[in-house]
């Protein structure tokens, strides 16, 4: 399957999220809301061993641990994993890539991965890895962003300089196809956040590490003049600057 993310730069992703580790939780209200919904979709599963794949600062690792799970926290960004470890969010910590999980087959009862797989070069490979490390009878819970996310920002940048400067996300049809090999459920949600100005909007993205990374570029776009041009081009509704997220939540059942 062709991915929208074929040129994703994993080193740039790890570096950006490591730098954002200190400010991530304060900026990550959407991430918390999405993760809490995803957690609720699997919280009744009786399995004990849980992998938090792309754990970030360990916010959800901690929530799962408090629910009695034995949590292994995995992240590509050393800075994020350091914060999770300092917070004693999990029982075990692994530095690694979700597309090459450093675990044996059938090691986990639950694999949880919230707003992570959009950074993968190959979504089917990432899901196959999570399936591999999950025991029969277990579940894989994931959420991701689909095409149409950050649409307003991309459209505004296009007016400024002819380039979109936002990450490419897979169409929902490709996400569905990636899940089709498994017994699964997939639900979607459109969430729009509003900001008082474009600078606040851009800082919210930088605060969670979600700058433009799919071609290895991060930041470097924002002189005062370019910010003014972006704000002038950005759609404003009743004094607010909207940013849309097209979300997909998946539950895959390990046979």
UniProtKB/Swiss-Prot annotation:
<dbReference type="Pfam" id="PF08241">
    <property type="entry name" value="Methyltransf_11"/>
</dbReference>
<dbReference type="GO" id="GO:0008757">
    <property type="term" value="F:S-adenosylmethionine-dependent methyltransferase activity"/>
</dbReference>
<keyword id="KW-0489">Methyltransferase</keyword>
<dbReference type="GO" id="GO:0010340">
    <property type="term" value="F:carboxyl-O-methyltransferase activity"/>
</dbReference>
<dbReference type="InterPro" id="IPR013216">
    <property type="entry name" value="Methyltransf_11"/>
</dbReference>
<dbReference type="GO" id="GO:0009102">
    <property type="term" value="P:biotin biosynthetic process"/>
</dbReference>
<comment type="similarity">
    <text>Belongs to the methyltransferase superfamily.</text>
</comment>
<comment type="function">
    <text>Converts the free carboxyl group of a malonyl-thioester to its methyl ester by transfer of a methyl group from S-adenosyl-L-methionine (SAM). It allows to synthesize pimeloyl-ACP via the fatty acid synthetic pathway.</text>
</comment>
<keyword id="KW-0949">S-adenosyl-L-methionine</keyword>
<comment type="pathway">
    <text>Cofactor biosynthesis; biotin biosynthesis.</text>
</comment>
<dbReference type="InterPro" id="IPR011814">
    <property type="entry name" value="BioC"/>
</dbReference>
<protein>
    <recommendedName>
        <fullName>Malonyl-[acyl-carrier protein] O-methyltransferase</fullName>
        <ecNumber>2.1.1.197</ecNumber>
    </recommendedName>
</protein>
<keyword id="KW-0093">Biotin biosynthesis</keyword>
<keyword id="KW-0808">Transferase</keyword>
<dbReference type="GO" id="GO:0102130">
    <property type="term" value="F:malonyl-CoA methyltransferase activity"/>
</dbReference>
<dbReference type="GO" id="GO:0032259">
    <property type="term" value="P:methylation"/>
</dbReference>
<dbReference type="InterPro" id="IPR029063">
    <property type="entry name" value="SAM-dependent_MTases_sf"/>
</dbReference>
